């Protein structure tokens, strides 16, 4: 029976769907869709960063690179939020959640990259205490990313965070199974196929 039952979770660019497949045929009445995909996550990150740091509204490609480099799905959202709040006071806490993303510099032929957050360096640059810093460091444009790293992909699981009246992925799965015979639930849950680019986000599979 399990080989006849397949539950496909597809989280791609435009949306996320849950589709039960029985003997090779999708069960149409049980398909569930969430209008959250990679595009929305990138746009949401872009909006947050533009409000808090640099204006990145027109930099969709760069912000997609940032998302793929730094974002993760939290398996303990409350704890990660608390660690982020403490980051300004305790360096060891900051290093566990907060990271720097050095924006690409096309003039110097440098691509963007993530590195551990250095609060002392950030404070120096913010205060204009630039003596002793290399020309390379001075020329860098850096995004400091803390709770953005996990609040953005959290929309896949809690879309109500941005006011969407739709179920997140776990509830979608339950809703999908609810219209199927109870005797088949275990068979579908024993054979889950997860596809789509968002499934590559660190922590996605563990959370699911």
What are these model-predicted stretches?
Residues 1-208:
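C-terminal region/appendage detector
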